[in-house]
Amino acid sequence: MLACRKPGLRPPLLLLLPLLGPLGPCSPGTPAAAAPADDAAELEFFTERPLHLVSPAFLSFTIDANLATDPRFFTFLGSSKLRTLARGLAPAYLRFGGNKGDFLIFDPKKEPAFEERSYWLSQSNQDICKSGSIPSDVEEKLRLEWPFQEQVLLREQYQKKFTNSTYSRSSVDMLYTFASCSGLNLIFGVNALLRTTDMHWDSSNAQLLLDYCSSKNYNISWELGNEPNSFQRKAGIFINGRQLGEDFIEFRKLLGKSAFKNAKLYGPDIGQPRRNTVKMLKSFLKAGGEVIDSVTWHHYYVNGRIATKEDFLNPDILDTFISSVQKTLRIVEKIRPLKKVWLGETSSAFGGGAPFLSNTFAAGFMWLDKLGLSARMGIEVVMRQVLFGAGNYHLVDGNFEPLPDYWLSLLFKKLVGNKVLMASVKGPDRSKFRVYLHCTNTKHPRYKEGDLTLYALNLHNVTKHLELPHHLFNKQVDKYLIKPSGTDGLLSKSVQLNGQILKMVDEQTLPALTEKPLHPGSSLGMPPFSYGFFVIRNAKVAACI
């Protein structure tokens, strides 16, 4: 039974679908009173013990490797504002990877771009993590040129016609310094398409990169390749799962002979679990699964070119994620049952995101629901594509302004702990009124062990109210309700928290995320098409202590 499982173990796969529904006999405590009106929904909590323990870096994010196509734009990573925003989401992994990663070649003799050189010169004789930002004239020039470079990158992505590019020691330094100064753990994706004549992986360029990073005493984790299931389409090269597994074994041997002998290795960063991809994942895990530390796969809900606002609000589309997770977990549990599973790259829509959707308030429904389902089903880490970069699914735009999903991510980081519990809504509203429950993040100064964090999405076009279970009904609750700001409604690129617009105080200061205390016994009101967090204080839940 679910109630008898140890923390951190995945429940049997047959139980995963019912997790969205009523809990049945496992639910402890006295049921709450009957809902007083049609707009009220009664909650059931399962808090006897955690379903799972996710990583403290559960919510992580990426920088797409295509940023290195023109290394001048790596200089953006010197922005103090961008670093402040990244630091707000620590602890987290920063994955550097993507399709372009398999077309990048490290050239240790390559000179840094003028913009990179200008940045490093401006940082000399200073603490690089505390010093000033990019020289203003350099930053202004790059910002003006970025929209044109963005179109180049998106065109390459849409057409799946990639060309090789080289990157320098300076680019590696810029990436590592950004991660280190932001409190992030860097995961670097190495080119897997460099092949010998007999189609084995050519590790010579990876060796050059390892040698350089070793000389700098960098602490880096590694990946090899991105979505190898699509190598044929991207590069005209077919590699089967067995060969890929052998390539990972070779990479692990390479790491073992270097300063990175204890480094983590993740993979295979495979696409969604469809027919040929499933076949590849199975054979990879059999051949090389032993040498990886976690199994990584990718997920997107919809095609960014044709996605609609209705797609972003459709509970049936949100639910498609469940079967993808189940398929992946089933494969891993059968072949490599002790391996953790990570969502190594994910967002709302593939192809760079959906224009005027993936960077708006509406995208938050997909993002928050994916976080909730991932934690509930046993995914240890979720890496959001991207923090900053080309397309529409970024957390931070081209002017380093945080977008709605950034603020949602920041609230998640501050309020949600790594012990995953269970909540459900009674009645027929489950698919459009989606709820998730964790122990509260006790690093938040206002909260303590035993507190609960409920997060919820209201996909109804009317206000709904949540009623806490009877034994928690009179507890103090802090509300963090997120709504769009301005006249664009669901398509707004700014948000308000409890009625206050969220924006940075200055380039190095994030705003306070101020709660709204509710009167004990109050229902938890949620306006139409909104999402938010509710911290139940002094809940004294034993599983959270």
Swiss-Prot record:
PTM (free text): Proteolytically processed. The cleavage of the 65 kDa form leads to the generation of a linker peptide, and the 8 kDa and the 50 kDa products. The active form, the 8/50 kDa heterodimer, is resistant to degradation. Complete removal of the linker peptide appears to be a prerequisite to the complete activation of the enzyme. N-glycosylated. Glycosylation of the 50 kDa subunit appears to be essential for its solubility.
Region (Required for transferring proheparanase to the Golgi apparatus, secretion and subsequent enzyme activity and for enhancement of PKB/AKT1 phosphorylation): 529-545
Residues glycosylated per entry: N164, N219, N461
Catalysed reaction equations from the record: endohydrolysis of (1->4)-beta-D-glycosidic bonds of heparan sulfate chains in heparan sulfate proteoglycan
Keyword line: Calcium, Cell adhesion, Disulfide bond, Glycoprotein, Hydrolase, Lysosome, Magnesium, Membrane, Nucleus, Secreted, Signal
Tissue: Highly expressed in placenta and weakly in the kidney, lung, spleen and uterus.
One Gene Ontology term of the molecular function aspect: heparanase activity
Subcellular location: Lysosome membrane; Secreted; Nucleus
Pfam families in the record: Glyco_hydro_79n (PF03662)
Gene3D superfamilies found in the cross-reference section: Glycosidases
Activity regulation comment: Inhibited by laminarin sulfate and, to a lower extent, by heparin, sulfamin and EDTA. Activated by calcium and magnesium.
Prodomain positions: 112-159
EC number: 3.2.1.166
Disulfide bonds: C129-C181, C439-C544
PANTHER family: HEPARANASE
Known function: Endoglycosidase that cleaves heparan sulfate proteoglycans (HSPGs) into heparan sulfate side chains and core proteoglycans. Participates in extracellular matrix (ECM) degradation and remodeling. Selectively cleaves the linkage between a glucuronic acid unit and an N-sulfo glucosamine unit carrying either a 3-O-sulfo or a 6-O-sulfo group. Can also cleave the linkage between a glucuronic acid unit and an N-sulfo glucosamine unit carrying a 2-O-sulfo group, but not linkages between a glucuronic acid unit and a 2-O-sulfated iduronic acid moiety.
Name assigned to this protein: Heparanase
Organism: Bos taurus
Gene: HPSE
